[in-house]
């Protein structure tokens, strides 16, 4: 199929005239805004397909058919034009390219390199849009419906999974070469956090062979594997009193005067892996090394009561002050209160608040003693005794990491809200939806791209990946010139103002510059 640029130009002009008539013609005078907007969008997609086809046709016509040199320096004559499909947001478009070939020497298609094409049919923009959706929503179902409603087509679940797998391959390499944040953008306290979250897994082949044909009551086809989520950031010291923490934590009226706004994490970097605690913390040590410097005055490690994680953190991060996450400590008090007073008792809140204040004020030993006294009381039921003892033992084991008065006076963070939110949002909200079961490779791929998105590295990562692909496929480096889409937007003040006023997080969407 031969495409003539002049014929396409005529079609484009005719279609554009049709667009003008659609918004200025007789029917537009009585049309509803909704019908015009919907019609315009579909027509613009159609026009976009023709314009993209015109671009490829003109590039093909301008491409020389004179012999080219192979990598070995031998001459490759023009053989014929060959076609490839370019699957874009405007649907599929055909690209005709001159094909140079000599038997026994090899083949080349120079236009592929000039256009920066990948080794499959999907356009980079289509990949980025669909993968961004896949990072936050299930592969099929509503995700596919959204694409179909927006563009008039969708990708299969298998195609999406394959694209995610391919585009996740370079994430580790990207972060290995990414420079650390500049010291001027950092705060004085370097904070690391680690926590685990279970992901439902399908049985691997060797496990399937050993599985029962018929499961017993309560058994499931699969199991959970722990993903270790790590976070590193810096934060400004924010001294506060136990009373202020209680007021904030229990949503009481805050003090009338606040000397400064709540400190916010700076340059937060999040990561999750199914490769185990050692692999996760080993990577975290490298991140710590990148963030170190004279600007860092204090180092804090926040963790829940997981003994395995605590032991590794103490060993691998010896310059860090390990702090037991205050939220986890408080949860143990709630467990004790529920067991002792009943889950519907109105007395629970005051009981928990008073003992939380004791813990924050450095009286954890007294709380432990009280819990053990109640556990030994003859009137205490067996279940209550078990929970009270469990809570007391948890506090006793973690006493070295519960010097909250010192932490608060120094302005250190005592709650791992960042990592708790990450476990819920980063892992659970995407990988633990109803009915989901994962293979480790599939879950790992998705976790890597979710990290790219959550770390607000989406645009930079995909630019890096395109550059690496150009080098791998064609041995060429990518120009540092301003992208054409940026030039187009910068030449239009209205578009520039729209892009510039966007929400920072949304600026990383594939359509943004």
Predicted regions and their residues:
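An N-terminal low-complexity regulatory-tail signal and nearby short nucleic-acid-interaction modules
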Residues: 56-119
């Amino acid at each position: 199929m031969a495409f003539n640029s002049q014929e396409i130009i005529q079609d484009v002009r005719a279609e554009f005239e049709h667009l003008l008539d659609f918004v200025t013609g007789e029917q537009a005078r009585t049309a509803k805004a909704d019908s015009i907007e919907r019609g315009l969008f579909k027509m613009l997609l159609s026009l976009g397909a023709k314009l993209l086809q015109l671009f490829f046709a003109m590039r093909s016509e301008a491409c020389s058919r004179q012999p080219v040199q192979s990598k070995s320096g031998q001459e490759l004559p023009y053989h014929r034009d060959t076609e490839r499909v370019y699957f874009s947001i405007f649907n599929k478009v055909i690209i005709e390219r001159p094909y140079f070939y000599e038997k026994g020497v090899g083949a080349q298609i120079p236009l592929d390199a000039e256009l920066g094409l990948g080794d499959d049919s999907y356009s980079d923009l289509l990949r980025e849009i669909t993968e961004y959706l896949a990072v936050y929503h299930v592969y099929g179902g509503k995700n596919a419906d959204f694409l179909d409603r927006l563009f008039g087509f969708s990708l299969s679940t298998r195609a999406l999974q394959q694209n995610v797998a391919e585009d996740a391959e370079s994430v580790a390499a990207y972060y290995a070469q990414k420079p650390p944040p500049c010291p001027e953008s950092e705060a004085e306290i370097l904070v690391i956090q680690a926590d685990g979250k279970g992901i439902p897994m399908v049985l691997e082949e060797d496990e399937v062979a050993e599985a029962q044909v018929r499961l017993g009551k309560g058994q499931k086809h699969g199991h959970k594997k722990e993903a270790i989520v790590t976070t590193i950031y810096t934060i400004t010291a924010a001294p506060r009193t136990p009373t202020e923490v209680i007021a904030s934590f229990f949503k009481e009226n805050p003090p009338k005067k606040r000397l400064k706004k709540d400190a916010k994490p700076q340059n937060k970097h999040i990561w999750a892996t199914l490769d185990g605690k050692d692999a996760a913390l080993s990577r975290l040590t490298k991140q710590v090394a990148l963030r170190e410097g004279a600007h860092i005055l204090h180092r804090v490690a926040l963790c829940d009561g997981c003994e395995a994680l605590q032991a590794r953190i103490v060993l691998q991060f010896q310059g860090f002050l390990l702090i037991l996450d205050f939220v986890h400590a408080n949860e143990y008090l709630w467990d004790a209160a529920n067991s002792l007073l009943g889950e519907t008792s109105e007395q629970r809140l005051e009981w928990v608040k008073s003992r939380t204040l004791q813990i924050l004020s450095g009286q954890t030993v007294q709380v432990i003693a009280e819990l053990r006294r109640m556990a030994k009381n003859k009137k205490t039921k067996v279940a209550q005794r078990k929970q009270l003892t469990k809570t007391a033992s948890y506090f006793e084991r973690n006493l070295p990491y519960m010097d909250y008065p010192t932490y608060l006076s120094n302005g250190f963070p005592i709650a791992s809200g960042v990592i708790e939110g990450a476990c819920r949002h980063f892992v659970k909200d995407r990988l633990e939806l109803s009915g989901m079961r994962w293979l480790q490779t599939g879950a790992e791929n998705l976790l890597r791209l979710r990290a790219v998105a959550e770390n607000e590295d989406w645009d930079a990562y995909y630019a890096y990946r395109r550059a690496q692909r150009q080098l791998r496929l064609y041995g060429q480096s990518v120009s540092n010139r301003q992208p054409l889409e940026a030039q187009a937007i910068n030449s239009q003040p209205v578009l520039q103002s729209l892009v510039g006023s966007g929400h920072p997080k949304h600026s990383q969407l594939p359509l943004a510059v």
